[in-house]
């Protein structure tokens, strides 16, 4: 087992990993930017080192500085968390070249799954259903139009190296295709340095369902059930839950088996997530595989009792999985709300500032992952997510009621948050009944914001 792990991240995920390391008897090394000098992950780590100024490109994305700290402090592994360098194949390879273990899949697998058109082709070979679309990259507007005519509008133009909703455009008719394609291509180049594009049939009003995977070095692969991530705004998830009301046990087993097939096809090792869209007609299709721990991993932990970060570390240390598929049972229901420092009434304007007052609720089946404390400075330099509120109940209605109670108790003063919007969603009748898909926020946002 590892003796010392560097956490190449910040915020609540860095705190989550540090706590896990301490529980496993492993020393934790934090890195931080000058803007994060007083952050909680810095205070909780056994050692902490400044790696640069506030700008992410000069700190949390600075591979040279991170690897230097890891080497000089005697670390034998690096955990990348999510975001930043977590899906950077170059970084994964450099960690290994420096004689340390990257807690995640290999650089080759990250490359394969990071290129969405390559991943799509591999899923076809594995027998995993994919959305009808282009076979490989689109080389020109005319080629794209020809493919779109073949599969039928509407279509979704996507960056092969994309993620987080960037480098992506919907197109409903041919006369709009050229503009949508060129806009998505330019955005992909700006965001990812790669303007390789592909295209899929746009599935209207789907559910976004993802399956959590664990795979070890000995060929053992299991899934830990699904998470329903359909409540999202502009392709950014807001709420997640498990299990999904939309899945029968038969469909759950079928999708879970396909998720395992996907992981086995690429020789996946460590924790990963296989994402699907579930169409209104009950058919489902592979979207992508995320080669890292997910923001919403606590939802799965609450219903399975499996510590996913602990399993990540064990797998990276070449230990066998602690669980067989038959050991995995989804007990009760879990729900997560992401709390962001933003103002929904002002177009979700970011709201940096000092947290002047804070009350963190508790109770049975309540978990709050955050780095907030009274006096904490929410920075304008980083992602707006400042907390994750997770609850567990015996069933979906119980967890919804519990989340309403927790959000009504949560106090974060000094900055604006989306807390009240989340609270209102939990009272919306379609949401409570489970009648929602990825278009829910788009359809209900105006009435929810005006209800405040």
Region roles according to the model:
Residues 31, 81, 133, 200, ...:
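A cross-family glycoside hydrolase active-site/sugar-binding cleft signature
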Residues 1-125, 138-146:
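ATP-binding N-terminal substructure of ATP-dependent carboxylate-amine bond-forming enzymes
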Residues 53-65, 109-111, 129-137, 156-165, ...:
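Short, basic, helix/turn surface patches
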Residues 7-23, 48, 71-73, 96, ...:
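ATP-dependent carboxylate activation and anion-phosphoryl transfer catalytic cores
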Residues 36, 54-57, 86, 107-114, ...:
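Alpha-helix capping and helix-loop boundary segments enriched in small/acidic/polar residues
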Residues 29, 79, 101-103, 131, ...:
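Structural detector of well-ordered beta-strand residues that form the stable sheet scaffold
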Residues 147-156:
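Acidic/histidine-enriched active-site and ligand-binding environments that engage anionic O-linkages
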């Amino acid at each position: 087992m590892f003796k010392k792990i560097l956490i190449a991240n910040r915020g609540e995920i860095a705190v989550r990993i540090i706590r896990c390391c301490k529980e496993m008897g492993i020393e934790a090394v934090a890195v931080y930017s000058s803007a994060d000098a007083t952050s909680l992950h810095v205070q909780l780590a056994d050692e902490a080192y400044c790696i640069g100024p506030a700008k992410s490109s000069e700190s949390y994305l600075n591979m040279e500085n991170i690897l230097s700290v890891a080497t000089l402090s005697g670390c034998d592994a690096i955990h990348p968390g999510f975001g930043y360098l977590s899906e950077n194949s170059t970084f994964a390879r450099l960690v290994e070249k420096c004689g340390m273990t990257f807690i995640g899949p290999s650089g080759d697998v990250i490359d394969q799954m990071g290129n969405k058109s390559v991943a799509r082709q591999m899923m076809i070979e594995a027998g995993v259903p994919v959305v009808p679309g282009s076979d490989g990259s689109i080389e020109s507007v005319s080629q794209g139009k020809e493919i779109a005519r073949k599969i039928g509008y509407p279509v979704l133009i996507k960056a092969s190296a994309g993620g987080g909703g960037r480098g992506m455009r919907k197109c409903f008719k041919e006369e709009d295709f050229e503009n949508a394609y060129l806009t998505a291509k330019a955005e992909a180049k700006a965001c990812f340095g790669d303007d390789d594009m592909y295209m899929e049939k746009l599935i209207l009003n789907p559910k976004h369902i993802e399956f959590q995977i664990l795979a070890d070095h000995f060929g053992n692969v299991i899934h830990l059930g699904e998470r329903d991530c359909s409540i999202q705004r502009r392709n950014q998830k807001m709420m997640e839950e498990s299990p999904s009301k939309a899945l029968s046990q038969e469909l759950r087993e079928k999708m879970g088996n396909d998720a395992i097939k996907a992981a086995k096809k690429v020789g996946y090792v460590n924790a990963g997530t296989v994402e699907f869209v579930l169409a209104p007609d009950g058919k489902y299709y592979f979207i992508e595989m995320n080669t890292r721990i997910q923001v919403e991993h606590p939802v799965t932990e609450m219903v399975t009792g499996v510590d996913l970060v602990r399993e990540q570390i064990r797998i990276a240390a070449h230990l066998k999985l602690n669980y067989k598929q038959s050991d995995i049972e989804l007990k009760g229901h879990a729900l997560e709300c992401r709390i962001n420092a933003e103002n929904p009434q002002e177009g979700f304007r970011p709201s940096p500032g000092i947290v002047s007052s804070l009350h963190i609720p508790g109770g049975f089946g309540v978990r709050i992952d955050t780095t907030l404390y009274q006096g904490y400075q929410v920075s304008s330099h980083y992602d707006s997510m400042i907390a994750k509120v997770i609850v567990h109940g015996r069933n979906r209605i119980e967890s919804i009621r519990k989340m309403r109670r927790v959000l009504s108790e949560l106090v974060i003063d000094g900055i604006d948050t989306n807390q009240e919007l989340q609270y209102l969603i939990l009272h919306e009748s379609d949401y409570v009944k489970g009648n929602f898909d990825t278009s829910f926020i788009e359809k209900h946002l105006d009435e929810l914001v005006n209800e405040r």
